Amino acid sequence: MTKHYLFEDSATGEEFIVGADCVTDANVIASEYFEEPHFVCRLTDFEAEASGLDEY
């Protein structure tokens, strides 16, 4: 089951969500799209949908 992980990119300040099975996989995906991604927290399905943030 895919979980939603909130990240912030230190280089740009952009917040974004990564959908992955675990936080380790989410970190790998985040690093493919952003220079300095930092994991913030895990979001529920509702929180991820309501946030309006881009999800990778």
Residue ranges of model-derived segments:
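Short aromatic-glycine-(Arg/Gly/Cys) micro-motifs in beta-strand/loop hairpins
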Residues: 1-14
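Short, mixed-charge low-complexity intrinsically disordered segments
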Residues: 31-56
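Acidic, low-complexity, intrinsically disordered interaction modules
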Residues: 14, 22-25, 29-33
